[in-house]
Structure formats: structure tokens, C-alpha cells
Swiss-Prot record:
EC numbers, comma separated: 4.1.1.37
One Gene Ontology biological process: protoporphyrinogen IX biosynthetic process
UniProt-recorded name of the protein: Uroporphyrinogen decarboxylase
Function of the molecule: Catalyzes the decarboxylation of four acetate groups of uroporphyrinogen-III to yield coproporphyrinogen-III.
Cited PANTHER family: METHYLTETRAHYDROFOLATE:HOMOCYSTEINE METHYLTRANSFERASE RELATED, UROPORPHYRINOGEN DECARBOXYLASE
Main location: cytoplasm
Sections of the chain in a coiled coil: none
Family of this protein: Belongs to the uroporphyrinogen decarboxylase family.
Record key words, sorted: Cytoplasm, Decarboxylase, Lyase, Porphyrin biosynthesis
Residues bound to substrate: R24, Q25, A26, G27, R28, D73, Y150, S205, H324
Organism (species): Roseiflexus sp. (strain RS-1)
Length: 348
């Protein structure tokens, strides 16, 4: 793209107004999404490129957001490695043959994601055609640790005790698992960039369950390796921006700086200016309104949004977002007004 507020902010370049997009900006809060969801299962939507492309475009048509993010899911990458994934009503994702031993790790396949998740790669191509340069497109993947946690726990977990048990008791198997996942994530993100993604985000949804020392020892080296591999393998100079986002990592921002991501996503558990000070001046930041704020009256949404923008103080390198994904109960009109307000307030 020749010009984009979002891409400029990722590179800490001056912009005329703060760019804004939202995690889960395509989702259940939108009536257009619900109309499709009534006819198709979740994985069916993810795995049908035409449906995924249409869902990706819905918030671009509805709101003045500065970027699209491909409609996809982080877990189908594990299917290609030999894990059986379903989405159960009321339970969320379930992996029916979880990884619990060194033998399970050794049995994992390492295929080419261009083949195993070809539907997402094709959806990216379709969205790039439909966008016609109106906005950049963000691709994404789960981080190696978060994918490992799902694979080991067999789904979501409150304490990730099975993951930690394998990590502590079988360090060699843990390293092998993380190496395989890092290779898969890197290849997947490179394929997304080759298909047209203008930036990519790495979601480390469960890394906040770890102590800082465990994050530094068992997770950080693989995030670093992944980012290095994507930059080296994408074939673009300069490489597209890489965003790293995790939930519950406000106490580890000094470590996150060491990932060497271009942008660090902040959740809502820290003031934006404090978080930015911890990640350092050489990194852009993304965030960080509590997504549940969007359930409040508009005056409160506006007040809290203005506070975040004031803390950014017009400094190059801020991308406005939520501290997590939009919740299903969010009023559509609040999202519309929020995107407009971010632009208007930051341009003053």
C-alpha cells in the first residue's frame, strides 16, 4: 500500500490521526455476521474462503477502521499436525487427542501450512482483491506457546497445569514441541504475507499464565526465533510489521521488548503510557481499552478513550485498539462512534 495510517504507526512514523482497528472486529456483535452464522458452523466459515472473506470485509464496510484482519482461527494449524479439533456447543474448542508425552510430541506431523490451511491463504487473496487498496490487511497466528497449551490441555484451561507439568518434567520434549510449532507458525505467517497480508499479529493468549522466569526460559526464545524467521523468509524489504500481543503480560513488558516485534499489544491492565515506558521508545504500542467498556454509556466510553489518547500524547507509534477482542454484547453503534471519535480526537 502506498499510504496507510496503520502501517505508518506500526513503523513509528507520524500520522494525521491515530489509526484504529479492533480485535474480533468481525464477530457475533454484528448482525451481518450472525446472519451467516445461522447458516454455517464456525469451522465451516473459517474453512470456506468466500465466507471468511465476506466476514472480514463486514467491519470495513460498517466502520471507519484503518485495517482489516482476516477472519480465521488459530487452532486449525494444529489439525495439519495430526490433532483432531472440534468446536463443541458451550465448551469451545476441544482437541480429542491431546499431546501429553514425549511420544505424542514425536508423532506430530510438520506439513506445509500452505496446504493444510490453504483456505485461509485463499481467503487473504480474496480480501486483498475486495479491499482494492482501501485498507491494509492483517494476517495472524497463534504463538507457539499458546498453540502448545491448547494441544496439551485439549482445550481451554484455567491454570494450564498439564502444560506446565510437561514443560517442567519433560524439557527435551517441550523444546521439540516448541521447535515444531515455531516452524509451523513461521511458515504460516510467511504464507499469509506471500498471499498479500500487509502486517501480521502473533496472539499469545495464554502466556499470561506463566511466571516471568518461565516465560523467559520456555517461551521467549521461540517467539524471537519465529519473528526472525518471518522477517528472513517473507522476501519483502522492509518486511511487513509484526505485532505481538498477549493477555495478562503487563508484568513482563520488559521481556516482551526482547521479542523484537515492531508493535507490542497491551491489554487493559496497565496505563498505556506506563506500558509504553516499559517496552521502550523503539517499539510501537497497540491498545488498550478494556473491551467491556463498550457496554457502558457512550459518555464513559468517550472519557476512557480520550484518557488513552491523552496518555499516548500524539507520539508516533500508537495504534488504538481494545485490550482484547470485542465481546458479543457490544452495541454496533458504539463501535462505529468509537472509531470515528479516535480519529476526530487525535487529529485535533
Amino acid at each position: 500500500m502506498t499510504h496507510s495510517r496503520f502501517l505508518a504507526a506500526c513503523r513509528r512514523q507520524p500520522v494525521d490521526a491515530t489509526p484504529v482497528w479492533f480485535m474480533r472486529q468481525a464477530g457475533r456483535y454484528m448482525p451481518e455476521y450472525r446472519a451467516i452464522r445461522e447458516r454455517y458452523g464456525f469451522l465451516e466459515m473459517v474453512k470456506t474462503p468466500e465466507l471468511a472473506a465476506e466476514i472480514t470485509m463486514q467491519p470495513i464496510r460498517a466502520f471507519s477502521v484503518d485495517a482489516a484482519i482476516i477472519f480465521a482461527d488459530i487452532l486449525p494449524l494444529l489439525e495439519g499436525m495430526g490433532l483432531h479439533l472440534t468446536y463443541e456447543q458451550g465448551e469451545g474448542p476441544v482437541i480429542h487427542n491431546p499431546v501429553r508425552s514425549p511420544a505424542d510430541v514425536a508423532a506430530l506431523r510438520t506439513p506445509d501450512p500452505r496446504e493444510t490451511v490453504a483456505y485461509t491463504i485463499q481467503a487473504i487473496r480474496l480480501v486483498k482483491r475486495d479491499l482494492e487498496g482501501r485498507a491494509p490487511l492483517i494476517g495472524f497466528s497463534g504463538a507457539p506457546f499458546t498453540l502448545a497449551a491448547y494441544a496439551i490441555e485439549g482445550g481451554s484451561s484455567r491454570d494450564h497445569r498439564l502444560t506446565k507439568a510437561l514443560m517442567y518434567a519433560e524439557p527435551q520434549a517441550w523444546r521439540e514441541l516448541m521447535e515444531r510449532l515455531t516452524a509451523q507458525v513461521s511458515a504460516y505467517l510467511i504464507a499469509q504475507i506471500e498471499a498479500g497480508a500487509d502486517a501480521v499479529q502473533i496472539f499469545d493468549s495464554w502466556a499470561g499464565a506463566l511466571a516471568p522466569g518461565d516465560y523467559a526460559d520456555y517461551v521467549l526464545p521461540f517467539v524471537q526465533k519465529c519473528i526472525i524467521a518471518v522477517r528472513a523468509g517473507c522476501g519483502i524489504v522492509p518486511p511487513p510489521p509484526i505485532i505481538y500481543f498477549g493477555v495478562g503480560l503487563s508484568g513482563m513488558l520488559g521481556l516482551l521488548r526482547q521479542t523484537d516485534a515492531d508493535v507490542i499489544g497491551l491489554d487493559w491492565r496497565i496505563h498505556l503510557d506506563d506500558g509504553w515506558a516499559q517496552v521502550g521508545p523503539g517499539v510501537a504500542v497497540q491498545g488498550n481499552l478494556d473491551p467491556h467498556t463498550l457496554l457502558a454509556p457512550w459518555t464513559e466510553v468517550r472519557r476512557r478513550t480520550a484518557d488513552i489518547l491523552d496518555r499516548a500524547a500524539g507520539r508516533p507509534g500508537h495504534i488504538f485498539n481494545l485490550g482484547h477482542g470485542i465481546v458479543p454484547e457490544t452495541p454496533v453503534d458504539t463501535v462505529r462512534r468509537l472509531a470515528e471519535f479516535v480519529h476526530e480526537y487525535s487529529a485535533e
